[in-house]
Structure formats: structure tokens, C-alpha cells
Design a protein with these regions (language model features):
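Short hydrophobic/aromatic beta-strand element in the GNAT-like acyltransferase core
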Residues: 50-54, 64, 86, 198-202, ...
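Conserved acetyl-CoA pyrophosphate-binding loop and the N-cap/start of the following alpha-helix
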Residues: 92-105, 115, 232-241
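Amide-forming acyltransferase catalytic core, primarily the GNAT-like/NAT-type
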Residues: 134-227, 231-232
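Conserved G/P- and acidic residue-centered "switch" motifs that form tight phosphate/ATP-binding loops
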Residues: 59, 89, 97
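A short, internal acetyl-CoA/4′-phosphopantetheine-binding micro-motif in the GNAT/acyltransferase core
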Residues: 85-94, 223-234
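Short amphipathic alpha-helix that is part of the acyltransferase structural core
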Residues: 2-69, 77-83, 148-185, 220-221, ...
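Conserved GNAT acetyl-CoA-binding A-motif
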Residues: 107-122, 247-258
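Active-site/acyl-donor-binding loops of N-acyltransferases
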Residues: 133-149, 228-231, 239-316
Length: 316
């Protein structure tokens, strides 16, 4: 059995990129999704190579974990956080505590940099031993039937560099009250999907940007990401999308990822939430997380939900 007595945990180097990609492929049954997600993370402005850690034994790379910096919303505050994803250990070395060493070291480094929360989607019997609490967030949706197509559909096009400030303002307006909401970022690539079947679009009214969506071509009535200036705009966006479909309007029911605390939700209908056991969070420093979780568990506050960054569109 391989020995773990000489495990070295260190930040990645550029020369590790090929080995890290191959490691994730082997650990995930030759899937290429995880290597691609790691590579895309490195193109983010917030990427920190000191939070991309490798485990080495006798000069051989046997493990890797990535903690990606984000800004999340919790109880009305913006909290510096990290997302643990992905993590991989060489199959021959699994079950020997290497993953735990990577996680613990990542927690210490992230905390030293001022990050207060770590969150992830993972196995609910493994991660709690490192301080993660299950059912920390989940998903939400609002069902919106298409009542009558708008006579004047909105202008629709791909996002451009000059749209990013308006997109950030739109996100702030729509999502600032939603717990666990993730700020997408201030670069164009934060708003463009790397998945060839998922299109990012902006919506304009009289030249003003009023909406944004990311939609999979096979799920046109189930946007993955939906931001609107207000409820009227949301209806106009749905109508504009519907005009491009061949289905009869009366048969269309849109599932929008609104949360009960989304700015536009109340005027559109009832948004419902579902918690996930695999959705976990861990406090790295003093933060609103314990109060948020206590309120959620006492049913005094709706459970939060993130709309995931574009690079996770690859994880289909």
C-alpha cells in the first residue's frame, strides 16, 4: 500500500498544471469536466494560487484541492468566502487522509487571508468532520405562465464588455436580499457561459439594459440564471423568449430561479425553496453564518440559494 508518511501540502505551481489536470481526470473516471473547471478558475480575477493546493509524496503529485474566492450575501451583509471545488486524490492513495490534510490546510490559509466562510456541494457524511453543516442552502424557483405574448419584444443580444457595470448593478438590485447569493464578478467572462449549449443574453428596452439570462438550448423555459429590472421586465423577457419557440403560448410555463427575497419575486408569484443535504457551509472566522443557519432551522428565514458562476455550466 502506498505510504503517506511524507505528504507535502503546498500551493500549486504553473509546472503542476498538466499533472493536476490528469489527476482530476483519473479521480473522476476520466471525466474532463473537473480539469476544465480548474483551468477556467485560473482565468478569474479572484483566483488565488495560494488557495490551489497540491499534495505531494516523494515528488509525485497525489492530491489537489481548489478554494475559489467569492463574495456571498448573508443576512444583508457581504461576506468574503471560498468555494471548495473540486478536490481529488490519486485513486491508489485514497482513504489515507490526504483529502483531509488538503482541506484543513486550505481552511487555515483561507482564514489567514480573511475569508470567513467556506461552502461546497459534497458528500454529507464526509465533510461534516471538517466543520461543514448540511442543508446550508439549496435551490429556489418560481413558476410563471405566459399569459399573453408582448407585442413589443425586448432587444436581445450577447453580452459585451461595456454591459458589465450595468449587469453588476442589475445583480445587486435583484439578488442583494438573497442569502448565499454569489456575486458573479466584474469581467466579461464572468457573464459568458463556456458551455456550447448554454447561451448568455442581455435584454434591452429603448437601449437600456434591463435583463440577463443564461439558458440551455434544451431547456428554453428553465433559465439557469435570470435577472430582471422589475416584474414587468421579467414578464417581457419571458414573452421575448417565448416568441422564439414554436410551442403555443398557452402551453408555456416558465421555471425561473427566483428566490422569495429576490427583488422581482413578490410581484410575480410565490417562489419556493428546497434545501439540499449536500449543500454545506463551514465558518472560518466570525460571520453571520451561525445566525443565518439558526434562523433557517427555526423556519424564521428562507434558506438561501446561489446562482452558480458560469464556469460551473460545464458540470452538466
Amino acid at each position: 500500500m502506498p505510504s503517506t508518511t511524507r505528504v507535502l501540502i503546498r500551493p500549486e505551481h504553473v509546472t503542476d498544471y498538466v499533472d493536476i489536470a490528469a489527476l482530476h481526470a483519473r479521480a473522476f473516471g476520466n471525466r474532463t469536466t473537473e480539469p476544465l473547471i480548474v483551468a477556467l478558475h485560473r482565468s478569474r480575477r479572484a483566483f488565488d494560487p495560494e488557495l490551489s493546493l497540491v499534495a505531494e509524496i516523494d515528488g509525485r503529485l497525489v492530491g489537489h484541492v481548489l478554494f475559489s474566492p467569492h463574495q456571498i450575501r448573508l443576512l444583508g451583509s457581504t461576506v468574503p468566502a471560498v468555494n471548495l471545488a473540486p478536490i481529488a486524490v490519486e485513486p491508489a492513495y485514497q482513504g489515507q487522509g490526504i483529502g483531509g490534510q488538503l482541506i484543513n490546510e486550505g481552511h487555515m490559509i483561507a482564514a489567514s487571508k480573511g475569508y470567513l466562510v467556506s461552502f461546497l456541494l459534497g458528500h454529507p457524511t464526509y465533510y461534516p468532520r471538517f466543520g461543514y453543516q448540511t442543508h446550508a442552502y439549496g435551490s429556489s424557483h418560481l413558476l410563471l405562465p405566459l399569459e399573453e405574448p408582448s407585442q413589443e419584444p425586448l432587444e436581445v443580444r450577447s453580452p459585451a464588455e461595456e454591459d458589465v457595470p450595468a449587469l453588476c448593478e442589475l445583480w445587486q438590485h435583484e439578488e442583494q436580499g438573497v442569502d448565499m447569493a454569489l456575486f458573479p464578478g466584474r469581467d466579461l467572462l464572468d457573464w459568458l457561459s463556456p458551455h456550447p449549449a448554454i447561451q448568455a443574453r442581455v435584454y434591452l428596452h429603448s437601449g437600456t439594459l434591463v435583463g440577463y439570462t443564461r439558458i440551455h438550448q434544451n431547456q428554453p423555459t428553465h433559465p439557469r440564471f435570470f435577472l430582471a429590472r422589475d416584474a414587468e421586465t421579467a414578464r417581457a423577457m419571458v414573452s421575448t423568449i417565448a416568441k422564439k419557440l414554436k410551442t403555443q403560448a398557452q402551453d408555456l410555463l416558465f421555471t425561473l430561479p427566483f428566490h422569495p427575497l429576490s427583488a422581482s419575486a413578490q410581484a410575480l408569484g410565490k417562489a419556493t425553496c428546497q434545501s439540499w443535504e449536500a449543500a454545506m457551509a463551514c465558518e472560518l472566522g466570525p460571520s453571520p453564518l451561525p445566525d443565518y443557519l439558526a434562523q433557517v432551522r427555526a423556519e424564521q428565514h428562507p434558506i438561501g440559494r446561489p446562482l452558480w458562476p458560469t464556469l460551473f455550466d460545464l458540470d452538466e
